[in-house]
């Protein structure tokens, strides 16, 4: 793939070449399940971090 184009007179055009656009595939049932599992793990981790922060801030006073 060239990083340039030429016009009808043969002059170089240094503008970016636009990539071909395509539609993404819809996520499968397995993908959706994996996203749900990752979201649940993330919620648990963030809740744990917040709990540790609350306990640590209360313990220092």
UniProtKB/Swiss-Prot annotation:
Membrane topology: Single-pass membrane protein
Disulphide-bridged cysteine pairs: none
InterPro entries: Psb34-like (IPR048028)
Regulation: induction: Expressed under normal light (40 umol photons/m(2)/s); less is made under high light (500 umol photons/m(2)/s), which disappears after 2 hours (at protein level).
Disruption-associated phenotype: Normal growth, photosystem ratio and O(2) evolution under all tested light regimes. Greatly increased levels of HliA and HliB are detected in monomeric PSII in normal light (40 umol photons/m(2)/s). High levels of HliA and HliB are visible at all times during growth in high light (500 umol photons/m(2)/s). A double hliA-psb34 deletion has high levels of HliB even at 24 hours, grows very poorly under intermittant light (5 minutes 500 umol photons/m(2)/s and 5 minutes dark for 8 days).
Family under the similarity heading: Belongs to the Psb34 family.
Role this protein plays: Involved in photosystem II (PSII) assembly and/or repair. Probably involved in conversion of late PSII assembly intermediates into mature dimeric PSII, it may mediate the optimal equlibrium of HliA/HliB among the intermediates containing CP47 (psbB) to facilitate photoprotection during assembly.
Protein name: Photosystem II assembly protein Psb34
């Amino acid at each position: 793939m060239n990083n340039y184009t030429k016009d009808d007179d043969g002059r170089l055009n240094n503008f970016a070449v636009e990539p071909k656009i395509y539609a993404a595939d819809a996520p499968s049932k397995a993908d959706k399940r994996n996203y749900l599992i990752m979201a649940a793990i993330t919620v648990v981790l963030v809740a744990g971090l917040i709990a540790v922060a609350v306990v640590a801030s209360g313990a220092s006073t």
